[in-house]
């Protein structure tokens, strides 16, 4: 697959087809090509001998997609930076990346950045004055050159720049289009901010198939009335999000086939897909295919996938995350560095062309997480799991296991069983510390329909069900009830916010 050529062919075949929609703003494939060509021509003329990455700042504006393509056509990787990212972090990204230029279709509120800023009217002037100019195709990003760099949280407190090459992205996009049976001209949900690599799962599969990206922003998500009004107008056919976001939508009774009659495919990544969430989706959208996928940012979005059917739901209480894409392989490594046999838990290691070339400007971190196995790049995920007959089962983060009163446990396992209880719509487990040790577990619960007059009676009923599924030491000591679970801008459960709320 020639990625950029595949996107550009739609400017010729379907020039007036909408490529991207955000609120009242939209761009066609013709405009996407013309403006990204103009921008690439300007970048090449301004920085003829430079290939440093370029920061692209904003939140869901159509100009961001134009800027992404303009950067790579000129031979520069882009760094997506969402408006929600704190100024201090933006500053550290600018310093770590060595970027010299920041592009934005909106006002840049961060000050004192060590980069040249081109935003709003200046960007539009470039589109206008360089219109009709085409960049030299030899300058475009290719092969093992970086296509984009996404910054993720680092254990040291400093963000890590994950370098994803052109070849990495091509491998992912080709697999996604083929394995998920994506069709020409479909409408894709774009829920994840561009600084979160889940967005790559909708951006490039949509653009290479001549589809339309329908973006919903964080303000819509915070106002359910606006969110569902937008969804009703969208005619979305391919849904890409975290499971938490879909679970939130399922709390609205009208979120069903009647709202989105042409829904064909649900693609989930970024979190564990609870069995009960998948089951509700099958009930609400009986004609749609549900795909559960797995992969870290360091392995280009996702490397495994499985079609979740009723048979799969009945067979597995904790859903598998799928079979590995054909050009990669999975190894389960034991603590002693040997490969675990089928069915035995260990650390998930991903090998193959989806694996990043490492962290930008951080050789020590790269050496710690990445290695070479049989001549191929490999990434040690820090995730626990096992493989049975080629099917991967994810068992949470190795560092998401806690020791409570001498017992080692996985919080996600408790959450899984809690969500399966009657009267529970959503739930998160928060471990509470006393000094340096964990003291007890708190369950934050979004209750479902029930007839209990007092909260303690509801808690007793839930605990009774949990006692049938979990040992006593894994039963939460305290329960707190909320109308919703807070989420990060990326659509994941905001565990830090929850912890600050319950310990305040």
UniProtKB/Swiss-Prot annotation:
Keywords, comma-separated and alphabetical: ATP-binding, Cytoplasm, Ligase, Nucleotide-binding
Keyword Lyase: no
A Pfam family annotated for this UniProt entry: AMP-binding_C
Record CDD domains: DltA
Pathway where this protein functions: Cell wall biogenesis; lipoteichoic acid biosynthesis
A Gene Ontology molecular function term of the record: ATP binding
Binding site for ATP: 152-153, 292-297, 383, 394-397, 492
Entry EC no(s): 6.2.1.54
Binding site for D-alanine: 197, 301, 492
Locations listed in the record: Cytoplasm
Gene Ontology biological process terms in this record: lipoteichoic acid biosynthetic process
Record's keyword annotation contains Nucleotide-binding: yes
Alphabetized InterPro entries for the sequence: AA_adenyl_dom, AMP-bd_C, AMP-bd_C_sf, AMP-binding_CS, AMP-dep_synth/lig_dom, ANL_N_sf, DltA, DltA-like
Reactions mediated catalytically: holo-[D-alanyl-carrier protein] + D-alanine + ATP = D-alanyl-[D-alanyl-carrier protein] + AMP + diphosphate
Source taxon at top rank: Bacteria
Cellular component, GO, one term: cytoplasm
HAMAP family xrefs: DltA (MF_00593)
Stated family: Belongs to the ATP-dependent AMP-binding enzyme family. DltA subfamily.
Function, as annotated: Catalyzes the first step in the D-alanylation of lipoteichoic acid (LTA), the activation of D-alanine and its transfer onto the D-alanyl carrier protein (Dcp) DltC. In an ATP-dependent two-step reaction, forms a high energy D-alanyl-AMP intermediate, followed by transfer of the D-alanyl residue as a thiol ester to the phosphopantheinyl prosthetic group of the Dcp. D-alanylation of LTA plays an important role in modulating the properties of the cell wall in Gram-positive bacteria, influencing the net charge of the cell wall.
NCBIfam families reported for this sequence: AA-adenyl-dom, D-ala-DACP-lig, PRK04813.1
Protein's recorded name: D-alanine--D-alanyl carrier protein ligase
């Amino acid at each position: 697959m020639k990625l950029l050529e595949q996107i550009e062919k739609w400017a010729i075949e379907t020039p007036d087809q909408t490529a991207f929609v955000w609120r009242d703003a939209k761009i066609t494939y013709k405009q996407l090509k013309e403006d990204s060509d103009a921008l690439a021509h300007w970048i090449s003329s301004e920085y003829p001998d430079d290939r440093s990455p370029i920061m692209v700042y904003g939140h869901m504006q159509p100009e961001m997609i134009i800027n992404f393509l303009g950067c790579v056509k000129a031979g520069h990787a882009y760094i997506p930076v969402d408006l929600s990212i704190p100024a201090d972090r933006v500053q550290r990204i600018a310093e770590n990346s060595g970027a010299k230029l920041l592009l934005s279709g909106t006002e840049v509120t961060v000050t004192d950045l060590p980069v040249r800023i081109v935003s709003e009217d200046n960007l539009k002037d470039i589109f206008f004055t360089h219109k009709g100019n085409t960049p030299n195709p030899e300058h475009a990003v290719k092969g093992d050159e970086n296509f984009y760099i996404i910054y993720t949280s680092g254990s040291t407190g400093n963000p890590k720049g994950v370098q994803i090459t052109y070849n990495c992205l091509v491998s992912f996009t080709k697999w996604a289009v083929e394995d998920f049976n994506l069709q020409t001209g479909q409408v894709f949900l774009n829920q994840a901010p561009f600084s979160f690599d889940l967005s790559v799962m909708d951006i490039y599969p949509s653009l290479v198939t001549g589809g339309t990206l329908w973006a919903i922003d964080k303000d819509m998500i915070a106002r359910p009335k606006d969110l569902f009004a937008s969804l009703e107008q969208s005619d979305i056919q391919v849904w890409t999000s975290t499971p938490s976001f879909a679970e939130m939508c399922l709390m609205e009774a009208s979120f069903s086939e009647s709202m989105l009659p042409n829904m064909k495919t649900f693609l989930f990544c970024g979190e564990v897909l609870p069995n009960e969430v998948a089951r509700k989706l099958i009930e609400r959208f009986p004609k749609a295919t549900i795909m559960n996928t797995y992969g870290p940012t360091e392995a280009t979005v996702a490397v495994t996938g499985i079609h979740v059917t009723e048979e799969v739901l009945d067979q597995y209480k904790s859903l598998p995350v799928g079979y590995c894409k054909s050009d990669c392989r999975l190894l389960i490594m034991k603590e002693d560095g040997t490969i675990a046999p089928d069915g035995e838990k260990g650390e998930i290691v991903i090998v193959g062309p989806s694996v990043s070339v490492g962290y930008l400007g951080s050789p020590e971190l790269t050496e710690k997480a990445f290695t070479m196995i049989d001549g191929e790049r490999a990434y040690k995920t820090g995730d626990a799991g096992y493989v049975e007959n080629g099917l991967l089962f994810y068992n949470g983060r190795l560092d998401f296991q806690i020791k409570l009163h001498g017992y080692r446990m996985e919080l996600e396992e408790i959450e899984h069983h809690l969500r399966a209880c009657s009267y529970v719509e959503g739930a998160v487990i928060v471990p509470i510390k006393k000094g340096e040790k964990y003291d007890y577990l708190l369950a934050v619960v979004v209750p479902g329909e029930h007839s209990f007059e007092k909260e303690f009676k509801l808690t007793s009923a839930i605990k009774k069900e949990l006692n049938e599924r979990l040992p006593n030491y894994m039963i939460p000591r305290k329960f707190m009830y909320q109308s919703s679970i807070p989420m990060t801008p990326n659509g994941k459960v905001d565990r830090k916010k929850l912890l600050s709320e319950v310990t305040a």
